[in-house]
Amino acid sequence: MTDDKTIRVFVAKPKQQTPKQHPTHTLSILNLIRWKNLLMIALVQLLIKYALFEPFLKTTELTITLNAFGFGLLVLSSICIAAAGNIINDIYDVETDLVNRPSKVVVGKSISEKTAYILFITFNVVGVLIGFYLSNLVGRSGFFAIFVIISALLYVYASYLKQTLLLGNIAISILVAMSILIVGVFELIPVITSQNQTTQFTFFKLLLDYAIFAFLINMVREIIKDIEDVDGDYKSGMNT
């Protein structure tokens, strides 16, 4: 009598692969915050300090407030708040961008809307907190309101003003001009004395001229963008 033998075959299970993260996730974040625009803001502010103010410190009565560390904080705060503004702008612009520039849409594709909101809040909090510290550092705690107002206005612009004829263009152009004026506010105003006030105001007026020029250039740019984006804006119900 033959014994029945059971032959067992063991089949190795294929290893489960860990889902790969999107290789361009970091690049997507950089595109979301529009790093080239942020770099331009930082460059302009650095030029104001080191090419406009610093050369005249020894030859005029010009006095500035911030050392390299303090000025670095001002630049960092500016680009953080601007980055937050760019993020919230992209979040609200998804529908129109899918029509006007579908290849450049980041939110909802390479970055989720939830992640975008987290980044928006993070950049805003960091930028405003640095502004709070910096305002107290120069002994002008009231300057903190500037950062809060800019942050709030960027949100209102993205969620409401951008959909309104010309009003949105004016608002964002004012914010662009403020990225220039804020250097004068923190560098010149806190150290005004009766001896140097003429010089301080002369340089502040010079900055004001630059800011007005930036306002006008950005207004033209925004109007041209509205003309280019008319199809997407119309389909989204925007009165631009």
Feature map (PLM): residue ranges:
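Multi-pass alpha-helical membrane architecture of UbiA-family
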Residues: M1-T240
